[in-house]
């Protein structure tokens, strides 16, 4: 009873802190405000510690690592977003991941808190298929890979949005240049100033897209490595539990598709002609594939991984 109460308190405290963090991120996204950035970072540290405490509490209470159903896996996924945020800030204080990880954490935590049936919050005895030491290795690697791949895909989507808007700006400028024949001196002067301003904005957008492409590549590369480890450990576990390394059930099939899309993305990044926007399109497709892989089997409730099926409120 004490552990259940503590878990309930930690869940709502984490959600409240993440709400404050995302609010400060939105306030400082367009304009740097002294003090709020530090408050946001301290908030993410607090979120990470409290979600860690929540997982440890549930682990002690249930006697196993909390990765047995959708509720527990979503908590771990939220923890994964927070972990990526912490690591990225340690390596490089200024990057774009914080604008992705904080909203991802709050949406995940919000769905955990209010989107699932209360019965799913209760810890249950592991089904025989999950009573293995491979649970920690396989499921944790898969969920951490999902967190990394989702963050990298969102960065690529942001890159596509900026690139698309940049191309629209160029088209609008060309229309303006060819729409007027002779322009008087004052209009020419104003046009030069506008073109100079446009060039500066264009250079800034170029730098921004390069940074987004760089971080997307790094994060997806990490996610691909974790996904590979998760699939390999799952194959070994499947051989022990079911006598076969691979069975092509829905979860395994979509995991393989996710791995393939990630591999294609990494391959396109090695070709200079396919970098940036072209590779970002592949990563954006991967964003949808990852969610199908994660939720698809739970919605269908079929296959060897169907023990995690769920119902919404």
Swiss-Prot record:
This is Cytochrome c biogenesis protein CcsA. Belongs to the CcmF/CycK/Ccl1/NrfE/CcsA family. The keyword Nucleus does not apply. It holds the Pfam family Cytochrom_C_asm. The chain crosses the membrane at residues 13-35, 43-63, 67-87, 96-116, 142-162, 219-239, 252-269, 280-300. The keyword Transmembrane helix applies. Keywords: Chloroplast, Cytochrome c-type biogenesis, Membrane, Plastid, Thylakoid, Transmembrane, Transmembrane helix. It comes from Amborella trichopoda.
């Amino acid at each position: 009873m004490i552990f259940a109460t503590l878990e309930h308190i930690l869940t709502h405290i984490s959600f409240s802190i993440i709400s404050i963090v995302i609010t400060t991120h939105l306030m400082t996204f367009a304009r740097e405000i002294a003090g709020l950035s530090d408050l946001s970072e301290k908030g993410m540290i607090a979120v990470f510690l409290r979600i860690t405490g929540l997982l440890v509490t549930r682990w002690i209470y249930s006697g196993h690592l909390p990765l047995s159903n959708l509720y527990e896996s979503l908590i771990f996924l939220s923890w994964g977003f927070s972990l990526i945020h912490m690591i990225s800030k340690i390596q490089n204080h200024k990057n774009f991941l914080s604008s992705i990880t904080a909203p991802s954490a709050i949406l995940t935590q919000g769905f955990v808190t209010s989107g699932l049936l209360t019965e799913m919050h209760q810890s249950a005895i592991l089904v025989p298929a999950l009573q293995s030491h491979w649970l920690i290795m396989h499921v944790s690697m898969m969920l951490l890979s999902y967190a990394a791949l989702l963050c990298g895909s969102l960065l690529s989507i942001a890159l596509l949005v900026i690139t698309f808007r940049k191309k629209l700006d160029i088209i609008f400028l060309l229309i303006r240049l060819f729409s007027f024949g002779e322009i008087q001196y004052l209009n020419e002067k104003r046009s030069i100033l506008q073109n100079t301003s446009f060039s500066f904005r264009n250079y800034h957008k170029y730098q921004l897209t390069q940074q987004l492409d760089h971080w997307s590549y790094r994060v997806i590369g990490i996610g691909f490595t974790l996904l590979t480890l998760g699939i390999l450990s799952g194959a070994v576990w499947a051989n022990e539990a079911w006598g076969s390394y691979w069975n092509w059930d829905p979860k395994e099939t979509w995991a393989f598709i996710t791995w393939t899309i990630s591999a294609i993305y990494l391959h396109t990044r090695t070709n200079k002609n396919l970098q940036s926007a072209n590779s970002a399109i592949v990563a954006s497709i991967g964003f949808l594939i990852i969610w199908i892989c994660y939720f698809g089997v739970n919605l269908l409730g079929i296959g060897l991984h169907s023990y995690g099926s769920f119902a919404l409120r």
